[in-house]
């Protein structure tokens, strides 16, 4: 009830009035029944603009820390995240990953929409990074349609380190800042029912994950990087160049 009220009367009107997000492919969202929405992750505001774009409620996993802050500020933050359909998830790995999987399956089992970012964290540089196979395991076990989604230009209005999106953006080569309209592109559902019962096969999981990431890349137009985003962030933090640590492509190997 809180989600529907705040989305309809507060979050959605403000987001649509100020940023006028461009939304395509809404016809690919089923009117009823479960589906897994998989999206690239460019900015904090992805979890605002995607729920605003889709008429049905989307449940997203979020860091449990967002729901456990102290004092009035902590309560307000927790209320905000719940208002945009997010639930607390321990993302520390191991058993926590299994708990996250089970939570997603429970949501889908209720016939709802569950959203997930296969990259596991926000892109450090606007490129699309290698997907984690948990998304494939969830898709195969749940047996639901997988709907690829591309968030576009959200990193421009909501750069790393910021929480509140900017209304106008100053870009290199332009004298005056301009209004950047974020985009939400929703692709056609992917069907992985042919892999039923194969959720323990790591080769199948990687193949399904890569197919999902390819669909997202086609929608977003992003460059794909064969490295986990978490690893890329570690390299940047250490002052290293991400591209120096990428495996050479087949064409590069032949050329040398």
Where are these regions (language model features)?
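A generic structural signal for well-ordered alpha-helical segments
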Residues: 14, 80-81, 107, 139
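A generic local structural motif
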Residues: 9, 21-26, 46-47, 74, ...
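Short gly/ser/thr-rich secondary-structure transition/capping motifs
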Residues: 16-23, 96-98, 166-169
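Short, basic, glycine/proline-bearing loop/turn elements
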Residues: 10-12, 83-91, 118-122
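Helix-to-loop junction immediately C-terminal to a conserved catalytic motif
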Residues: 9-41
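Residue-level signature of transmembrane alpha-helical entry/exit and packing/kink sites
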Residues: 4-8
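Catalytic core of membrane glycerolipid acyltransferases/transacylases, capturing the structured
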Residues: 29-94, 99
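Non-catalytic C-terminal accessory region of glycerolipid acyltransferases
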Residues: 2, 98-256
């Amino acid at each position: 009830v809180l989600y529907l009220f705040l989305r309809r009367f507060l979050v959605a009107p403000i987001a649509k009035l100020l940023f006028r997000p461009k939304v395509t492919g809404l016809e690919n969202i089923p009117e009823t029944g479960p589906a897994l929405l998989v999206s690239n992750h460019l900015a904090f505001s992805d979890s605002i603009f995607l729920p605003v774009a889709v008429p049905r409620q989307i449940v997203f996993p979020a860091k449990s820390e967002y729901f456990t802050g102290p004092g009035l500020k902590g309560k307000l933050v927790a209320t905000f995240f719940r208002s945009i359909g997010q639930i607390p998830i321990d993302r520390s790995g191991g058993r926590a990953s299994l708990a996250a999987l089970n939570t997603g399956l429970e949501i889908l089992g209720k016939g709802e929409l569950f959203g997930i970012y296969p990259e596991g964290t926000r892109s450090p540089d606007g490129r699309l990074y290698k997907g984690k196979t948990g998304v494939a395991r969830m898709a195969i076990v749940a047996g639901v349609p997988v709907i690829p989604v591309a968030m576009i230009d959200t990193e421009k209005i909501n750069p790393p380190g910021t929480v509140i999106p900017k209304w106008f953006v100053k870009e290199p080569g332009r004298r005056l800042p301009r209004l950047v309209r974020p985009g939400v592109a929703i692709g056609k559902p992917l069907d992985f029912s042919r892999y039923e019962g194969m959720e323990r096969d790591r080769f199948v999981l990687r193949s399904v994950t890569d197919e999902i990431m390819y669909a997202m890349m086609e929608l977003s137009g992003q460059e794909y990087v064969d490295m986990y985003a978490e690893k890329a962030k570690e390299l940047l933090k250490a002052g290293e160049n991400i591209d120096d640590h990428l495996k050479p492509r087949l064409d590069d190997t032949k050329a040398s």
